[in-house]
Amino acid sequence: MIQPGEIQSIAGKGGVRDTQIEKDYVISWVMYGIANNLFLKENLVFKGGTVLKKVYFPDYRFSEDLDFTFTGKDFDIEAIKAAFNKLIEWVYEESRISLSVQNETQHDTGNYNFYLSYTGPLGGAGANKDIKVDISQDELIYNAPEEKKIINTYSDLEEKYSIFCYSLGEVIAEKMRSIMQRTAPRDIYDLWYLFEVEGQDIEDHVFAFQDKAKHKGYDPNKLIKVIEQKEKTFAKHWKDHLANQMTEIPDFNDVWRELGKHWRKFHKFIE
C-alpha cells in the first residue's frame, strides 16, 4: 500500500479531494485482482464510465463504480462471490488494503450488484468509503471485447496488467442506450466528450445502439424525443452530479448545444 503522502500529492496536483484519489487507487487494485483471478478475468468484461478513465483516457473524469458484463455460460452468483472473496484475500496479501462485500442485491433481471467497502492509505472507514460493483448478464455485446492494459500512476502498481474491456464503440452505443433508461448527467457528459473532444462519429455507432436499444425493449427511433424530454432534469443536476468527478465542469448549455448537431446527424442517418 502506498503512503498517504502519495495520495495527497496526486490530489493536490489534480485539484481533487484526497479521498477521490484513494478510491481511484483502490479501484486500481481491484482491477489488478481481477487480472490475477482466472475466473473473473475470463468471465467479466469491464465497461461504463470507469473504463474510459482506467483504459482509454487517463486524464478523464473520475468514476466511483465498477461495471461489468458477465460473458460466461452460467451466471452463477455463488461462483462470482467465491471469486471475489479470493480477490479480497489476494489484494490484502499483496497490498494490505482491506476489502469486504456489503449490501448485495440480485435484481429481477438476474443482474447482481454489491458494494466493496475498503480501508486504504487514508485509514479507517468513513462516508463514501465503498465502491459499487455492478455485474449484468442481460447485455447484448455488439463488438468483440478487447484485452486492454489498465492505466496506473501509483508507485506500487508498476507491473503491467490487462483485462477484457468494451471497445470504445461499445461504450458509446451503450451510453446512448442508457439515456433511454435513466437520467444521469454523466451519460451526457461522456457522449459530449467522446463526440466533441475525441472526434468520434455518431454514425459509426448507430447500428450497435439500435441493437442494444431493441434488446432492452426500447425504440431506438425515439432517442432524440427522450433526450429532449429529459433536458430540464439533466440541467438541474448537472453540477452537483459531476462535482465530485472533475475539477472543471463545462457549461451545460454549451454541452447541450454542441451535442445537438450530433443528434441531428443521428436523425438524418436513420431517416
Where are these regions (language model features)?
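Structured mid-to-C-terminal alpha-helical surface segments
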Residues: 1-44, 54-60, 64-66, 70-271
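Glycine-rich beta-strand-to-loop/alpha-helix junction loops that act as flexible
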Residues: 46-50
